[in-house]
């Protein structure tokens, strides 16, 4: 069976992999030059920008996709825990570090 998945964000890639694991011939369509959807990262004027959420809060879902193909994710990706997830720099040059830990951010 042939399947088309539109969008290569986390959801699109996961859907394409699940279909492929079930024997479908999958075509993945993405309008941007890079995969990742809102999780992609791009550079502009010397700065690096997140296209959207890039913090992985449920790594077990990634592991599940690798298991479909009997692959060990450790052979392909490295997930590194970060103390600070994001640093926001405001116009007045003040900074706010977001870590996901309410006590740490007080």
Give the residues covered by each predicted segment.
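N-terminal glycine-rich phosphate/pyrophosphate-binding loop and immediately adjacent elements
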Residues: 1-106
């Amino acid at each position: 069976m042939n399947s088309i998945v539109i969008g290569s964000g986390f959801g699109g890639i996961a859907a394409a992999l699940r279909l492929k694991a079930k024997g479908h011939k999958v075509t993945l369509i993405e309008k941007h030059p890079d995969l990742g959807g809102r999780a992609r990262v791009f550079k502009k004027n010397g700065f690096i920008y997140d296209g959207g959420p890039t913090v992985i809060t449920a790594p077990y879902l990634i592991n599940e996709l690798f298991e479909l193909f009997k692959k060990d994710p450790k052979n392909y990706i490295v997930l590194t825990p970060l103390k600070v997830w994001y640093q926001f720099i405001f116009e007045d040059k003040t900074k706010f570090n977001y870590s996901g830990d309410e006590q740490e951010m007080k």
